Amino acid sequence: MKRTNKNIFLSSGALFFLIMPIGSIGHDIVFFVVCCSYSLFTFYVLSDTTSFKVKMAKSLIPLIYPVAFHVPIHIIFSDAQVSILSTASYFLAVGFGILIYCTKNRLRIVPIAAFTAITIFFATKGYDLWLHKVNYGTYLGGVEEAITNIELPNANGEKIVLTGYNDEIIVLDFWTTSCGYCFQKFPVFDQVRKKYTSNSRIKFYAVNIPISRDKSGDALQIARELPYGFSHLFSPTEAIARQFNVNSYPTVILVKNGRILYRGDVGGVSSSINKLTEEELKKMNL
């Protein structure tokens, strides 16, 4: 196919719209596919026999579609942060495609290796870190924030203090009745709890945050039907979630001595608990 501006524009458009549905599977997969396909496509465009300036101009044509479709979404909708990296992958792929093409043959292995490493990292661990940042405000979960004295009722109406004084470790799993993913993560939260049953100073609670469609007693009824060993607490308003800076569900919070020390996914809280218990053992052995 002759590499005219029109053909490049149409071909890159077809490639763009073929990739777009992959976003429903995962933006990490989009990142990988875009990096592979767009870098190769850019290299192919540059392999034409036209002058260098014309080649450079043609290599930027594939960016018309992501600029026209994705960039405005990120400008208008703050919730689109989750897909920023997959959008950036178009520019990364074209940039490295140009760099690889312009590098002399013997040195080409350097940008190829760098691009491969970046692609693999962000298509795997890097995207997980970014999602953690978007959902919880931190890349790895570690925070250190003071929290005021907070009490919430349990299923029996008894008030439970959540500030973790006297070296107690309080682990909270925030959920709502409409959050299907919260229910999927409950078994994982319970498995974490089981690991620390021998330590009476580590407490695990699932904290329900009410939503507008909840009827009185809905959350309590659901909690009583769940087959897990952790206790349930019930917030009367969303204000509690704001006090803990919870912006998405589920969110797991670890509190000790009036300070939030972890905010993130349930999968990362065990390392924070282990770190705290190890520090306590060291103090005891001094």
What are these regions (language model features)?
Residues Q184-E225, P236-Q243:
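Structural microenvironment flanking redox-active thiols in thiol-disulfide oxidoreductases
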Residues F17-D28, A68-Q81, Y127-H132:
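Juxtamembrane "helix-exit" motif on the non-cytosolic side of transmembrane helices
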Residues R106-H132:
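Internal/C-terminal transmembrane anchor helices
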Residues R224-G229, P236-M284:
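Thiol/disulfide oxidoreductase modules built on the thioredoxin-like
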Residues D128-L162:
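N-terminal "domain-start" segment that seeds a small globular fold
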Residues M56-Y101:
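Membrane-embedded alpha-helical segments of integral membrane proteins
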Residues I160-Q184, F189:
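Short active-site neighborhood of thiol/selenol oxidoreductases, capturing the structured segment around
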Residues R3-M20, S59-A68:
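Alpha-helical transmembrane segments
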